[in-house]
Swiss-Prot record:
Gene Ontology biological process terms, A to Z: mitochondrial genome maintenance
Designated name of the protein: Large ribosomal subunit protein mL67
Main location: mitochondrion
A GO-annotated cellular component: ribosome
Family matches, as Pfam families: Mhr1 (PF12829)
InterPro entries (UniProt xref): Ribosomal_mL67
Keyword Ribosomal protein assigned: yes
């Protein structure tokens, strides 16, 4: 039978006794403590000699006028000119559209504006060889940043509705429901025609709280609310209301002039130009072909 020998029991007992002896000599095990073992020296006040120029600089930095950005009236925190222009970029292969208040786009724009439409259908990063400028919206007049940011907000809202609320569209919704997941994702990615139509609608005053309307040209606030509701309902039905005297003027610069025909109609307050300002000045590296 399996039995434990006397020598094994002796060794185990000897080990326990040795451990007990060490514990008795060293004392009880000290638990961890959050208090520092050494005293932390208190900070001493040092006398520094400063020059008169350094003292004047410190006084200027403490002044709130030095730290305040040059912002527009009533829009604190936004630098001057922010929102006067709105850029739209599109993916030349998949047709996705990204809006920006700057002439460049980053990966953050892609994360915030592009929803998940399917596996391997969302770009992982911004590649300059795939993204091209679609159009640039410029508002007429000075200090139109608040109006531009309102237009930017409406464009993003309409784009989000096209991508996530497509089932409410009777005809288009039925077409997408009968397609596979990948085909449906490809259709949802192609937002270029919808984005052009959204530009025409937003610049025509569509959307609640759209600042494209000039309040000063209307008789009363109730009249303004009525005109906004009228224009919003007409745009939803596919029409554009002629509100030339009630809308701010805007100019749309196109990379390709044919893209503007994706919209059914443009309001009279919008003018169109070919060529985005600043694109022609960019230096392009010449393509060198081998003689072989």
């Amino acid at each position: 039978m399996n039995s434990v020998t006397t020598s094994t029991i002796g060794r185990l007992a000897f080990g326990v006794s040795r451990l007990s002896a060490v514990t008795n000599v060293a004392g009880a095990v000290r638990h961890a403590s959050t208090h520092p073992t050494t005293a932390i020296p208190k900070p001493t006040t040092a006398v520094l000699k400063t020059s008169p120029l350094a003292e004047e600089t410190a006084v200027e930095l403490k002044s709130p006028s030095r730290l305040q950005l040059k912002s527009e009236p009533g829009n604190k925190g936004n630098p001057k000119g922010h929102g006067d222009r709105i850029w739209a970029f599109h993916h030349i292969e998949q047709g996705q559209v990204i809006y920006s208040t700057k002439p460049v786009i980053s990966h953050q724009h892609l994360i915030r504006q592009q929803p998940f439409t399917g596996k391997n259908l969302v770009p992982r990063k911004i590649r300059k060889d795939y993204w091209r400028p679609l159009a640039m919206i410029e508002l007429a007049g000075k200090d139109q940043g608040a109006v531009g940011r309102s237009v930017y907000q409406k464009l993003r809202e309409f784009k989000k509705r096209h991508e996530l609320d497509w089932a409410n569209e009777a005809e288009e919704g039925r077409k997408l429901m009968h397609k596979s997941k990948r085909e449906r994702g490809q259709e949802l990615n192609d937002q270029k025609p919808n984005s052009v139509a959204d530009m025409a609608a937003v610049l025509a005053g569509a959307g609640k709280g759209n600042l494209m309307w000039q309040v000063s040209r209307l008789g009363s606030s109730s009249e303004l609310v009525g005109e906004i509701k009228k224009a919003s309902g007409a745009v939803e039905k596919g029409a554009v209301v002629d509100v030339k005297r009630q809308l701010r003027r805007a100019t749309v610069y196109w990379t390709n002039e044919q893209d503007k025909f994706h919209a059914r109609e443009w309001s009279d307050n919008v003018s169109h130009e070919v060529g985005i300002p600043g694109e022609a000045e960019k230096k392009r590296m010449p393509i060198r072909m081998s003689s072989e």
